[in-house]
């Protein structure tokens, strides 16, 4: 074979390869666009980059296991996600108890699922943390006269539950604190305490556990809080609700094959799901009512 013929043959093989690749890509793209797009959002527990890393694998799973293509649309803060749902910029969202009730006041949303915790129960907790080098703070009552960082005012585990816990368990009110401030993300609260900007902070249990070996200690833990609801707009197709439920309720964390998938997801929902209903969040209503009578407006 001459050199020219060899070059020609190689070029032909390369051309055929890229032609096949392009055709495959076109088919893949066609399959993708053939699915109806559903936009999914979640309360901003962490910085947006971390949120994307922890939530995109769930979108990929839902796209693969339902007749829909799920795309993640992140909000800048807790309040914005309510606007996303109201304006139909997202159809499905993972909310907190407070954001669910706030959304429910403004338009109709339906809770369909709630995540399980590591113990297999559909609850999580608020955790009060302090620096592990701080010898003055060892229990809840030690927070009197101290500075405390809270998460968003719309956060259940980072604002509502810790305030309720302080008021009912320790008799400590906001006026008894040296100062306090709300931050956008739970991991921001943890870092503010680590940096010494605040004596203590209130975060969701998964964040407390993540920072426990990085300089924070756990001071106290709240009563169980009903799991973060996955909600849908009331006008979505029943087929969409059924598809989401089927895909997520079929997972069992004790199944090794399922666990490989679920461990790519955020700690908040990697242990499985249970069905949710509005009355599951009556305890959140109770906390809001109690604090309201004490002059604390939530949100």
Residue positions per predicted region:
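Short helices/loops that flank or line small-molecule/ion binding pockets
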Residues: 79-93, 106-107, 124, 141, ...
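Bacterial N-terminal signal peptides that target proteins for export
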Residues: 1-10
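A ligand-binding cleft/hinge motif common to bilobed small-molecule-binding domains
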Residues: 94-107, 165-168, 191-220, 224
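Small-molecule pocket liners
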Residues: 123-128, 226-232
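Short beta-strand->loop
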Residues: 110-121, 176-179, 212-225
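An extracytoplasmic/periplasmic, membrane-proximal ligand-sensing/linker region
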Residues: 32-41, 46-57, 232-299
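Bilobed "Venus flytrap"/periplasmic-binding protein-like clamshell domains
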Residues: 35, 40-63, 75, 98, ...
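Bacterial N-terminal signal peptides
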Residues: 9-19
């Amino acid at each position: 074979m001459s050199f020219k013929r060899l070059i020609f043959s190689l070029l032909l093989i390369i051309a055929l390869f890229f032609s096949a690749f392009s055709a495959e890509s076109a088919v893949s793209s066609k399959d993708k666009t053939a699915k109806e797009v559903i936009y999914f959002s979640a309360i901003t527990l962490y910085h947006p980059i971390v949120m994307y890393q922890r939530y995109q694998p769930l979108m990929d799973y839902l796209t693969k296991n339902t007749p829909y293509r799920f795309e993640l649309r992140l909000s800048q803060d807790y309040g914005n996600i309510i606007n996303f749902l109201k304006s139909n910029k997202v159809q499905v969202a993972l909310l907190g108890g407070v954001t669910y009730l706030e959304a429910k006041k403004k338009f109709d949303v339906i809770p369909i699922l709630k995540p399980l915790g590591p113990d297999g129960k559909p609850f999580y907790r608020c955790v009060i943390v302090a620096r592990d080098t701080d010898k003055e703070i060892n229990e809840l009552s030690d927070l009197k006269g101290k500075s405390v960082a809270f998460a968003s005012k719309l956060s259940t585990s980072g604002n509502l539950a810790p305030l309720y816990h302080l008021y009912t368990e320790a008799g400590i009110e906001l006026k008894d604190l040296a100062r306090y401030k709300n931050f956008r993300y739970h991991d921001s609260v943890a870092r503010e305490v680590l940096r010494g900007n605040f004596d203590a902070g209130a975060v969701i249990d998964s964040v407390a556990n993540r920072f426990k070996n990085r300089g924070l200690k756990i001071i106290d833990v709240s009563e169980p809080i009903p799991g973060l609801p996955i909600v849908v707009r009331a006008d979505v197709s029943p087929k969409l609700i059924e598809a989401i439920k089927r895909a997520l309720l079929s997972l069992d964390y004790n199944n090794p094959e399922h666990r490989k998938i679920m461990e790519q997801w955020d700690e908040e929902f990697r242990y499985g799901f249970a069905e949710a209903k509005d009355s599951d969040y009556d305890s959140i209503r109770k906390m809001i009512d109690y604090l309201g009578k004490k002059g604390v407006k939530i949100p």
